[in-house]
Amino acid sequence: MGLMNAFDSQTEDSSPAIGRNLRSRPLARKKLSEMVEEELEQMIRRREFGEGEQLPSERELMAFFNVGRPSVREALAALKRKGLVQINNGERARVSRPSADTIIGELSGMAKDFLSHPGGIAHFEQLRLFFESSLVRYAAEHATDEQIDLLAKALEINSQSLDNNAAFIRSDVDFHRVLAEIPGNPIFMAIHVALLDWLIAARPTVTDQALHEHNNVSYQQHIAIVDAIRRHDPDEADRALQSHLNSVSATWHAFGQTTNKKK
């Protein structure tokens, strides 16, 4: 029996004993593209197509599943969003391994929508505080001399960028990225990058002078964090980090209040 015929041959038990209080309503049928997507995903997960291997051509998939080209293309696009295939112009889809970035990226739309709701930014800032608090404690306990040197280099770039707001923001993100790299967990890195991207995108536009004052405060707080990590003092590193992020949160909240009053 062909694949699509197998889908179509499924029967439903019409016994009245099922859910006496349920109202009669038709069940939504899956789109052909969703059925093709699910079958291809299972084939990939069963290693019928290995990592780096190309899938059959669109024409071959159309014949195999007995569907049209749009259904095949929609299915492949969905697999690409999941990180299961790569699609380059003029080439057949190639099986790939989902990365932590792919997994977190799937949440991006929902996260940005959540940030736009009342209290959304505060919730994400709290998440960042809990997350980075664990990172600095780990760094203070386990960071190698080489990793501490990388933090010091990031701090130096931070210092050199104080008079350039755009450069300072980049160096600020890089400083916290080095912290996230210390445990060596790619999921931590993906979460950290996404969190900062989402929060920075939600920040209001402020004057260069206001940002310059904020940059100097942040830089001094970064120094305190690195000093505590260098002394391998997790409690002090945690206190310095929490003081820093609470200050950042309060500052950007004040910026937002000022911006709203001017509107």
Curated annotation (Swiss-Prot):
A Gene Ontology BP annotation from the UniProt entry: regulation of DNA-templated transcription
A GO term, aspect molecular function: DNA binding
Keywords on record: DNA-binding, Repressor, Transcription, Transcription regulation
Entries under PROSITE patterns matching the protein: HTH_GNTR
Domain of life (superkingdom): Bacteria
Name of one Pfam family that matches: FCD
Positions of the DNA-binding region: 58-77
Sequence ranges assigned to domain HTH gntR-type in this UniProt record: 30-98
Span list, region Disordered: 1-22
Activity regulation field: N-acetylneuraminic acid (Neu5Ac) inactivates NanR by converting NanR oligomers to monomers.
Family matches, as PANTHER family: HTH-TYPE TRANSCRIPTIONAL REPRESSOR NANR (PTHR43537:SF53), TRANSCRIPTIONAL REGULATOR, GNTR FAMILY (PTHR43537)
Function (record text): Transcriptional repressor that controls expression of the genes required for the catabolism of sialic acids. Represses expression of the nanATEK-yhcH, nanCMS and yjhBC operons. Acts by binding directly to the Nan box, a region of approximately 30 bp covering the promoter region.
Family, per entry: Belongs to the NanR family.
Assembly: Homodimer. Might also form higher-order oligomers.
Protein name: HTH-type transcriptional repressor NanR
Source organism phylogeny: Bacteria, Pseudomonadati, Pseudomonadota, Gammaproteobacteria, Enterobacterales
